[in-house]
Amino acid sequence: MISLKAQYGLKAMVSLAAHYGKGPLQAKDIASSQDVPVRYLELLLSQLRRARLVDATRGKKGGYYLAKKPNTITVYDIVTAFEGSILFSQNGRNESDNFAFVWKNAEKLLVKHFRAMKISDLIPKLR
């Protein structure tokens, strides 16, 4: 349903949220705390930068930081940065299918849930 890439991206974003206001975090530190290979995490962070959720500074004290306040970034923002959208109804299913309403309703519920959940709400889950 939700890719491993999006799951790791969410974990990285929550790590950055927990560090918000304390300066940038280096990719290696995020990677070790989330048990993700550094090179893979850097690819994810670059995708989050393109989505304007993360920014970075170069140099010895450089690293990554949130581009917005943690209480304004939703799980939906992060998942769609990786997935593009959350669609159950078009996963090879015909819209005229008698059960298309099931997938549409599931999609609406998940989108509503992800939009309501801020990454700041997930910080306690890191510990």
Regions from the language model: what does each represent?
Residues 2-10, 14-36, 65:
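N-terminal helix-turn-helix DNA-binding core of bacterial DNA-binding proteins
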Residues 91-127:
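C-terminal regulatory/oligomerization modules of transcriptional regulators
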